[in-house]
C-alpha cells in the first residue's frame, strides 16, 4: 500500500520447446509454414494497437498496490489479451476475411463497371452542357445582374453630423 520502494517488473517467460507461435498445430515441414518473424503488418496499418500493460494501467508514486497484486494483474492482463485474441481470431478471422473479400470484390466490380463509365460519360457530355450554360448566363443572368449593379451603383449615402 505505498510502502514498497523498489519497482517490480512483471514478465512472462515461456520455453521455446513448449510454446508454439502457430495456433498450437504441429506442422510436419517447418519450411512450408510461415516464418514467425514475418511482418504481418508491413504498412503499419495497426500500429496504434501495439499496447501493453503500462499503456493502460499506471499507478502514481503516491498510490501503489502490493507488488504481488501488480505482478499478478500484469500477468493476467498479458495472458488474457493473448488468449482472447487467439480465440477471437479462431472464431472470426476466416468468416470476416470471407465477408471482406466479398465486399471488396463487389465494390471493385461496381467501381469498374458502373462508377468509372458513368463519370466518363458525364465528362464527355459536360462540354455541351458548358456551352449551353454559358449561353444562358450570357443571355439572361449576366444582363440582369449588370442592371442591378447599375441601379445599386447610383445609390449614394451621405452622413451629416447632428
Swiss-Prot record:
UniProt entry tagged with the keyword Zinc: no
Residue intervals annotated with topology Cytoplasmic: 1-86, 108-162
One matching Pfam family: Caveolin
GO MF, one annotated term: D1 dopamine receptor binding
Residue positions where Phosphotyrosine is found in the record: 19, 27
Compartment(s) where it occurs, according to its Swiss-Prot or TrEMBL record: Nucleus; Cytoplasm; Golgi apparatus membrane; Cell membrane
Membrane topology: Peripheral membrane protein
Family: Belongs to the caveolin family.
Protein name: Caveolin-2
Species name: Didelphis virginiana
Amino acid at each position: 500500500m505505498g510502502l514498497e520502494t523498489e519497482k517490480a517488473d512483471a514478465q512472462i517467460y515461456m520455453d521455446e520447446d513448449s510454446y508454439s507461435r502457430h495456433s498450437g498445430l504441429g506442422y510436419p515441414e517447418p519450411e512450408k509454414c510461415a516464418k514467425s518473424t514475418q511482418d504481418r503488418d508491413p504498412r503499419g496499418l495497426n500500429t496504434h494497437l501495439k499496447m501493453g500493460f503500462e499503456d493502460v494501467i499506471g499507478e502514481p508514486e503516491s498510490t501503489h498496490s502490493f507488488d504481488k497484486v501488480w505482478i499478478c494483474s500484469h500477468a493476467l492482463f498479458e495472458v488474457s489479451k493473448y488468449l482472447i485474441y487467439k480465440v477471437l481470431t479462431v472464431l472470426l478471422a476466416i468468416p470476416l476475411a470471407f465477408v471482406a473479400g466479398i465486399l471488396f470484390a463487389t465494390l471493385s466490380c461496381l467501381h469498374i463497371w458502373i462508377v468509372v463509365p458513368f463519370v466518363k460519360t458525364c465528362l464527355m457530355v459536360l462540354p455541351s452542357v458548358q456551352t449551353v450554360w454559358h449561353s444562358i448566363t450570357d443571355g439572361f443572368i449576366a444582363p440582369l445582374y449588370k442592371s442591378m449593379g447599375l441601379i445599386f451603383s447610383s445609390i449614394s449615402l451621405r452622413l451629416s453630423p447632428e
